[in-house]
Amino acid sequence: MKYEIDAKRRTVRVVPEREEDLYFVYLLVERGDVVRGWTVREYKPEGAKEGERVKMYLAVRVESLEYHKFRGSLRIRGPVVEVQEGVEGVKGRRHTFDVVPGREIEIEKAAEFPLDVVEEILKMAQALMPKVLLVSIDDEEAAFAYITALGVELIQVVHNASKGEESLFDGYLESVRKQVDELSRRLKPDKLVVAGPAMLVEHIARYIRGDKAPQGSGGLAGVYEFIRSGLYDELKTQMGVKAYEKLIHMAATSRESVAIGPQEVEEAASLGRVDFVLVLDSYIKESPEKAWVLLSQIYKTKGRIYIVREDTEVGAGIRAMGGIAAVLRW
């Protein structure tokens, strides 16, 4: 994602380049912000009988956001507070910005918002991590998962209706191939990985071209085995999986070396003790003022920040800890 921060004007100009970038824009935009950009809306000039769709530059004060990860869409709604000259009657009316890859918007933040942490968040979006379509297969089922820097999304599980009938097994593999073709067209992954028992992975290579990842299990269980394996360590680091694994280990072996929950993390941050923090995206959206001030404090003391999606395995663990947890320096 391309971005430019103007500290004097308190603005962040962003150009999302991938659907994943929309997630980071969603994290940054809060109620009360002013969002500017080019858009298209219905406009009826004075004296005209009918309105028409007109491209115009305007700004809205944000009242609500709607982010759909499955559709890869972000909508920002609010009343129009600025509009280009020559367009009468639009100011004060409500408008919806559809934020899409390739279209620039400018976000004006409130005076109390800590701009210093914004760049750290946007750097996460700039990390060019591979998008992986994982096919985890055994002789009973094939599980499809989409793995990006944002987390692991389980898409579908296809069951083998021909269990025990060797003559029909190739029909099962053919149905898996068709599903792979459909998902590849829709998701456009950078890599396709086939995981499962070694003999089956070799056999299905006749139907599907992709990286082979032989392992003990396939299907749904194989998805979790793949995530925990040493493959794609860089991806796991970006997702916060390795940080979470260290957090869990430290919590079990040296409880005083971790901070769990908002109160403990706030106390540690005030002393500059946070080495790294894992925070849920939902925690930020539920208490934005409090969360951003805390993250800024951690950032200023050289702490690393991992924002974790709630709908991931790591996210479920952090949710159980109160939405935020950290490993401490001393």
From Swiss-Prot:
Belongs to the eukaryotic release factor 1 family. Pelota subfamily. May function in recognizing stalled ribosomes, interact with stem-loop structures in stalled mRNA molecules, and effect endonucleolytic cleavage of the mRNA. May play a role in the release non-functional ribosomes and degradation of damaged mRNAs. Has endoribonuclease activity. This is Protein pelota homolog. Keywords: Cytoplasm, Endonuclease, Hydrolase, Metal-binding, Nuclease. GO terms for cellular component: cytoplasm. One of its GO terms (biological process) is ribosome disassembly. Its main location: cytoplasm. The keyword Hydrolase applies. The N-terminal domain has the RNA-binding Sm fold. It harbors the endoribonuclease activity. Its cofactor is a divalent metal cation. It is found in: Cytoplasm. Monomer. Its EC number is 3.1.-.-. One of its GO terms (molecular function) is endonuclease activity. It holds the Pfam family eRF1_1.
